Amino acid sequence: MRLIPLRNTAEVGKWAARHIVNRINAFKPTAERPFILGLPTGGTPMEAYKYLIAMHKAGEVSFKHVVTFNMDEYVGLPKEHPESYYTFMHTNFFDHVDIPAENINLLNGNAADIDAECRRYEEKIKSYGKIHLFMGGVGVDGHIAFNEPASSLASRTRIKTLTQETRIANSRFFGGDANLVPKYALTVGVGTLLDAEEVMILVTGHGKAQALQAAVEGSINHMWTISCLQLHAKAIMVCDEPSTMELKVKTVKYFRELEAENVKDL
């Protein structure tokens, strides 16, 4: 596992965006051989999306031959709802870059047959072989996507019941009322994430410090689903200073020295 210790949220977003752009450009995608990118929603990746848009407008990257799969979507929320992840992605990213509409994949939380929708999504991911890079965030309780504590580490795309803690955390997008946050969501599974060639998790804020500590220094434990990334061959944690507060000093020092050349010019 790599840990990229940075100073603040802006640096986390910039580093993550540069890494994505470098991966896409090195891959040299074509229509027949697209780059497959997994994407999250929420507050954490906002800076990364801003930098990706800026780099696209500067001519540094094209998303014309990039296929995206989002991590999750609320169940029962109309896709036109201002807080649906469909709306979030189009407002904050897709509408500002040159990605073709047919290359965008989002879960349908209003499907008549939810189980069939989850199978369809999983099968479509597999039809491309694998996701080359999955960017994600982490919840205060260590969840990735909507794989809440005690999720199976072999799980696939499915419906999940959201914990009250997650609904309270997400209530800031619903006028502060947790009762307006849907109780269920569709999410890619832990196993789906582990199948990706590379997983990059963005961790910002002191509230995520315990989750980062569990992921880096703790044991693999389904109560901290983020810890599953210890099993991944290419996992990266990109974190700001407040999120490292629960890590041992020597752990942060080790990774800071190890990644010194990779965090220049931020």
Swiss-Prot record:
Its EC number is 3.5.99.6. Pathway: Amino-sugar metabolism; N-acetylneuraminate degradation; D-fructose 6-phosphate from N-acetylneuraminate: step 5/5. It catalyses: alpha-D-glucosamine 6-phosphate + H2O = beta-D-fructose 6-phosphate + NH4(+). Allosterically activated by N-acetylglucosamine 6-phosphate (GlcNAc6P). The record marks 151, 158, 160-161, 254 as: Part of the allosteric site. Gene3D superfamilies: 3.40.50.1360. Keywords: Allosteric enzyme, Carbohydrate metabolism, Hydrolase. It is an enzyme of class 3 (hydrolase). One of its GO terms (cellular component) is cytoplasm. Coiled coil: none annotated. GO terms for biological process: carbohydrate metabolic process; glucosamine catabolic process; N-acetylglucosamine catabolic process; N-acetylneuraminate catabolic process. InterPro entries: Glc/Gal-6P_isomerase, Glucosamine6P_isomerase, Glucosamine6P_isomerase_CS, NagB/RpiA_transferase-like. The active site is at residues 72, 141, 143, 148. It comes from the Bacteria. PANTHER family: GLUCOSAMINE-6-PHOSPHATE ISOMERASE (PTHR11280:SF5). HAMAP family: GlcN6P_deamin. Catalyzes the reversible isomerization-deamination of glucosamine 6-phosphate (GlcN6P) to form fructose 6-phosphate (Fru6P) and ammonium ion. Belongs to the glucosamine/galactosamine-6-phosphate isomerase family. NagB subfamily. NCBIfam families: nagB, PRK00443.1-5. Homohexamer. This is Glucosamine-6-phosphate deaminase. It comes from Yersinia pestis. The gene is nagB.
